[in-house]
A protein has these predicted regions:
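Phosphate-binding/switch loop-helix module in NTP-utilizing enzymes
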Residues: 81-142
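Glycine-rich P-loop/Walker A and Walker A-like loops and their local beta1-loop-alpha1 context
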Residues: 1-58
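Short, structured coil segments at secondary-structure junctions
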Residues: 39, 65, 173-175
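Nucleotide-state-sensitive switch-loop elements of NTP-binding domains
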Residues: 4-7, 13, 61-95
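Phosphate-binding/switch region of NTP-binding enzymes
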Residues: 152-153, 158-195
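Structural motif
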Residues: 17, 44, 118-121, 155
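Substrate-engagement module of ASCE P-loop NTPases
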Residues: 136-162
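Short, charged/polar "capping" segments at the starts of alpha-helices
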Residues: 51-56, 79-80, 163-166
Length: 195
């Protein structure tokens, strides 16, 4: 595991870019959520990767309580799927609709105001398929600063070799640290993010 912390970080939030091999990104998602829930943190998953219904089934299969996980789904409507009603889900028409995505994030952050929350963005790599890299970089910078201003931790998942070096450099300057994900147990090592 490589974990490079940025010196001089003094605030209470932790913004982390987690890199994984493509075949391990789902394990990374599960490991991160498991760690958050064990620490009493409310996970808010922003998915531009898989639909809400699929994620909920996977989380339940992995022993995670779907009722404790909030989802912003930018995939279901885009793919022509049916949107399930639910208190823990907000739908955005497509991953390129950054205005609605930003509004949904803001609204979900306002829910449960007295509880510690953490955003998991799944995934930066998939977002880059839908929008130009410059636009993605600006949007992610906006989201990361919103998290800092609201004292919410953020974990941004990404396929390790899926980023242009320029984008990786930009994101590296936005985050507090970069973690290379090696195993499902590593999600438990994220105590500094969710404690």
């Amino acid at each position: 595991m490589t974990d490079a912390a940025k010196p001089g970080t003094t605030d209470d939030t932790d913004i982390c870019l987690m890199l994984s091999l493509p075949e391990r990104i789902q394990q990374m998602n599960i490991g991160v959520l498991r760690s958050m829930l064990q620490k009493g943190c409310i996970p808010l998953v922003v998915t531009v990767n898989q639909p809400y219904r699929i994620l909920m089934k996977r989380y339940a299969k992995e022993g995670l309580d779907p009722q404790k996980i909030f989802i912003i789904d930018a995939v279901t409507q885009y793919s022509g799927g049916m949107c399930d009603d639910g208190q823990n889900v907000r739908y955005v028409t497509n991953p390129a609709n950054l205005t609605d995505l930003g509004i949904a994030i803001t609204e979900m952050l306002k829910q449960n105001p007295d509880q510690r929350k953490c955003i998991v963005f799944d995934s930066v790599s998939m977002l880059l398929i839908h929008i130009p890299s410059v636009t993605a970089s600006k949007f992610l910078h906006f989201v990361m600063n919103k998290l800092r201003l609201t004292n919410v931790d953020g974990i941004f998942l990404c396929v390790e070799k899926g980023l242009d070096p320029v984008i990786l450099t930009q994101l590296s300057s936005f985050v507090d640290r970069i973690v290379e994900f090696d195993s499902p147990e590593q999600g438990a090592g994220l105590a500094t993010i969710t404690s």
